[in-house]
Amino acid sequence: MRVSFTAPGHLRDQAVKLIAGAFLLPVALLGSASASEFRTAAVSVARVDWRAAAEQLKAEIGPDSAAASRFNFAPQRRFRSHDPRSLPAIVQLNGATAALFTGISRSPVPVLLPFDTAGYFADRAHGVPSSLSIGHYQSGFRTLDLFDAGPAGYSAQFALEPGKDAAEGLPPRTFTKPVEVQITGSLLTYDINDPEAGKGEPVKALAAQYPDLRRTVREGFVRYAFTKFGVPYVVSIQCLDSKPRAKRLACREASPIAERFIKSLRIVGGKPSRPRGYLASQPAERPATPSPDFTYRPSGAILPGTGYRGQPGHADFTVYSQIRFPLQGAPAYANSQSFLNWGDCFHRGRVPRPTGKGASYRCKSSDKKLVLDETAGENYAYPWQDNFCEARDFNVGQCAQGYGHQGQDIRPASCPQRHGNADRCEPNHFGVVAVRDGVLLRSPKQQAATLLVNTSAEHIRFRYMHMNPSMMDADGVLHGRRVNEGERLGLVSNYQDYPGGTTTHLHFDVQVFTREGWLWVNPYVTLIASYEHLLGQRGREVAAEPVETPAGPPPDDVAKPEEAVEGSE
């Protein structure tokens, strides 16, 4: 059965969701699924107004310009609106820009970039050499670091070099590194329970160009979200919402750059495609054969007393993507690093203060007995434990008080030691692999590597932390590299600002695209499902650990974003 809608975008999306829910309700009532049933994500699909995009391209090129003669703006109404032949100017545009932005015609949404399309074509018409740098047309932003277009939409990253601000009419800044600006336009948006959705302040200077534009600062980025041609777009810059610093970009310095970027956006390509329907949540596939060994605590069941200011965890039973497990082999152990053996208790303090290998202590916020020994057996044992909303200095909208860990920590199979008396694990023994086919997002020296996945049913990012940056640089884990699922990206290490700065583990997190931009979601159940597929066996949920929390008020955690590491480079 096919259902067609011609209502405006938001109303149509809501109608499709209601109808999908009505069809699924009888199934839910007849089944005996528990509240913890693993399910796939629900994803909304935009309806693109390509005729409006073609009209804007015509206005940007200018009807009397030297470049106008190379485009046929007459709509071909004998073709359906989703047929690229219905808009020859868009096809011609793709043919001209494909050499500049590889794969641009794969995007099912209009590609907006800070590129002077009219100036570029006028120069070609007047015989200006094609050898002129593409950066000449990019409004001061250097050649783009990344451009990725696919069935879900597109993402791009540009950078503004230090010292270019004055030349571009921007205020001076304290930050001394290049400012990286990201833009995503997506056909797909994930339907997550986002308490901050729709908030933000309008930007008067850009209201005529983008009437619904909103500016927000959340989850470590200043974000500008807007809708154009029925499509959600988000421009974002990673920044710190505090005073300017030489090594940390302040959001107040990032905002003028983002607004300069948005003012420069022009249509550069993209291709109409057949409309798609709402992707309703479904039960996730899991192996039927039970595992004799693999057990896990429930989603959201963080160690007692380890949440920010005593907050609980965030239960989320969504398998956001059927991924390959990020470590090369099994066994592996998902659990806490800060609040298990050798952990630093998130700076809350250890009591008594341990003085040597094997010394007993506990975190002030918990009665759980620990030892100063990273090699302790509990660290390398089932069951797994969620630590997505464990106390950290990172803004995470999915966590109860807005702060959490952003991802899940995973230890490898074992803890090699340099010698018998060592209380630390030797890093760089266990492989880390790509969880899906995709493209990498990472600048040299950065501590994080992100894998971007763009398919007809997914627009999702996976971030890897604590591998050694020098080794990643040497291995070519850099912007634009395409990798295959299972391809090695590096080795599990302990890098956090410097080698040995944390325990030997992989921090793994998931971001999905929403109308607010890329947001962190709990990866725990996604990892359980991927591990089960690696094993070919189904894990068993066990009760949360009964650990008492010391009497008294919850920990008075004070967020110090300037000290945060995992959410930064």
Mark where each language-model region is.
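N-terminal secretory signal peptides that target proteins for export/translocation
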Residues: 1-16
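Bacterial N-terminal signal peptides
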Residues: 19-29
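Short, solvent-exposed recognition patches
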Residues: 37-231
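Surface-exposed amphipathic alpha-helical segments
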Residues: 238-283
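Acidic, glycine-rich catalytic/binding loops that coordinate metals and/or anionic ligands
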Residues: 286-341, 473-487, 498-569
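Short glycine/threonine/proline-enriched tight-turn/helix- or strand-capping micro-motif at secondary-structure
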Residues: 337-431
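Zn2+-dependent peptidoglycan hydrolase active-site motif and core
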Residues: 397, 404-406, 420-422, 426-476, ...
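A structural signal for short beta-strand/turn segments enriched in small hydrophobics and glycine
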Residues: 432-434, 438, 480-492
